[in-house]
């Protein structure tokens, strides 16, 4: 039942249900609806059609590993651990599903590529020295190359073709069977009648089995770099073993310290080329001109040094002459300064006494003012008390007179 206080208000429809209507949505909902509508109708947004059945079939046996994850808010600078994704599929820990040979091959190939990149980076940064560790980057590079070559040699997809997934459990047997099949086909193959044999390197082209040799330039480059690094290491060890203390003053050994054998040979070859008979005359002429210039420079330098020394001696003599005139008056100046020092000390003490006297005088004057004020108050109080006493005596005399009558 409606509240009776609203019964007599105008504009109320009685005996009808209450209806609340509005023309538009609230402002926040309007803005959100406009943004969604603009995004749906915009030509810049790519609309991707997702097949839910295909997505379900792809991810129905997959699980998300939440071990060690932390998506909580942080107040420190350290980052939280979220989901990680890689370039290949790796089974998570604790799933209980055995890794297939194809997945294992992809994982090993990716790890070897990462190891190769790290070794190449270490080779470019680590300096070669005689006191290296046992597992050097060069040795590690050789091991990585051998491991990668072994993995490439077991590349089952290229060797066995599209049927590799069926025979992954026995790759050696599958490879042997495939080779035997190819040999049998090659033996039993004959040229069809009425057709000429295919062109090839020999007359019996169909009676041979053709094998393809695939060359990897990056692998050859990596092996060559590893060999060069190993050679430089051995040369460094050899130089460290046969090297003796070189004379730093010897002009033939200038610039040879710390250089490798090839650089040393090139430097020595350049120095030997300078000793050619055809260039000795030119070198001698240049040396003569340089020697003449050096002699002229030495003469000018000696003259400049003599003039500089003479000017310094003259300045020193003038200073000594001035000092002679000042030395006679110096004791008197010192005595006068000592007397002035004593006078200044006495003046400072007198100033301190005056300051103390001034402070004391101010204190005394303040005390006198306080005492004067107190005396005035006492005198005033005494006058008031005397007046009161006189009044009391007067009243007492009057009473005594009344009583005596």
From Swiss-Prot:
Coiled coil, from the record: 101-134, 383-403
UniProt record, GO biological process: axis elongation; microtubule-based process
Disulfide bonding pattern of the chain: none
Compartment(s) where it occurs, according to its Swiss-Prot or TrEMBL record: Cytoplasm, Cytoskeleton, Microtubule organizing center, Centrosome; Membrane; Cytoplasm, Cytoskeleton
Membrane topology, from the record: Peripheral membrane protein
Pfam families with a match to the protein in the record: Dynamitin
GO cellular component: centrosome; cytoplasm; dynactin complex; dynein complex; membrane; microtubule; vesicle
Region ranges (Disordered): 1-24, 186-207
Major subcellular site: cytoplasm
UniProt KW keywords: Coiled coil, Cytoplasm, Cytoskeleton, Dynein, Membrane, Microtubule
Listed InterPro entries: Dynamitin
Keyword Membrane: yes
UniProt subunit comment: Subunit of dynactin, a multiprotein complex part of a tripartite complex with dynein and a adapter, such as BICDL1, BICD2 or HOOK3. The dynactin complex is built around ACTR1A/ACTB filament and consists of an actin-related filament composed of a shoulder domain, a pointed end and a barbed end. Its length is defined by its flexible shoulder domain. The soulder is composed of 2 DCTN1 subunits, 4 DCTN2 and 2 DCTN3.
Family: Belongs to the dynactin subunit 2 family.
Role description: Part of the dynactin complex that activates the molecular motor dynein for ultra-processive transport along microtubules. In the dynactin soulder domain, binds the ACTR1A filament and acts as a molecular ruler to determine the length. Modulates cytoplasmic dynein binding to an organelle, and plays a role in prometaphase chromosome alignment and spindle organization during mitosis. Involved in anchoring microtubules to centrosomes.
Protein name: Dynactin subunit 2
Native source organism of the sequence: Xenopus tropicalis (Western clawed frog)
């Amino acid at each position: 039942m409606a509240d009776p206080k609203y019964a007599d208000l105008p504009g109320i429809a009685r005996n009808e249900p209450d209806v609340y209507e509005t023309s538009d949505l609230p402002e926040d909902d309007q803005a959100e609806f406009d943004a969604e509508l603009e995004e749906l109708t915009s030509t810049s947004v790519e609309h991707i059609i997702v097949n839910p059945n295909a997505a379900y079939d792809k991810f129905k046996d997959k699980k998300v590993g939440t071990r060690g994850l932390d998506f909580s808010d942080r107040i420190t600078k350290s980052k939280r651990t979220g989901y990680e994704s890689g370039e290949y599929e790796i089974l998570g820990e604790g799933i209980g599903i055995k890794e297939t040979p194809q997945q294992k091959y992809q994982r090993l190939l990716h790890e070897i590529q990462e190891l190769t990149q790290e070794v190449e980076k270490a080779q470019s940064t680590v300096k070669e020295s005689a006191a290296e560790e046992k597992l050097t980057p060069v040795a590690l590079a050789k091991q990585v190359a051998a491991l990668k070559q072994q993995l490439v040699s077991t590349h089952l997809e290229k060797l066995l073709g599209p049927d590799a997934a069926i025979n992954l459990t026995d790759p050696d047997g599958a490879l042997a069977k495939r080779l035997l099949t190819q040999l049998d086909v090659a033996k039993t193959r004959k040229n069809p009648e009425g057709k000429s044999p295919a062109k090839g390197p020999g007359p019996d082209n169909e009676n041979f089995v053709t094998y393809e040799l695939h060359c990897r330039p990056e692998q050859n480059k990596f092996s060559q770099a590893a060999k060069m690094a190993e050679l430089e290491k051995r040369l460094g060890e050899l130089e460290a073993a046969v090297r003796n203390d070189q004379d730093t003053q010897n002009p033939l050994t200038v610039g040879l310290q710390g250089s490798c054998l090839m650089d040393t040979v090139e430097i020595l070859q350049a120095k030997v080329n300078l000793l050619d008979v055809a260039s000795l005359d030119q070198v001698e002429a240049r040396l003569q001109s340089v020697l003449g210039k050096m002699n002229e420079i030495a003469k000018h330098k000696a003259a400049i040094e003599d003039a500089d020394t003479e000017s310094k001696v003259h300045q020193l003599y003038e200073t000594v002459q001035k000092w002679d005139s000042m030395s006679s008056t110096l004791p008197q100046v010192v005595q006068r300064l000592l007397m002035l020092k004593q006078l200044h000390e006495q003046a400072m003490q007198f100033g301190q006494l005056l300051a103390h006297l001034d402070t004391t005088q101010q204190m005394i004057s303040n005390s006198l003012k306080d005492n004067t004020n107190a005396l005035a108050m006492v005198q005033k109080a005494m006058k008031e008390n005397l007046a009161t006493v006189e009044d009391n005596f007067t009243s007492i005399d009057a009473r005594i007179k009344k009583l005596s009558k």
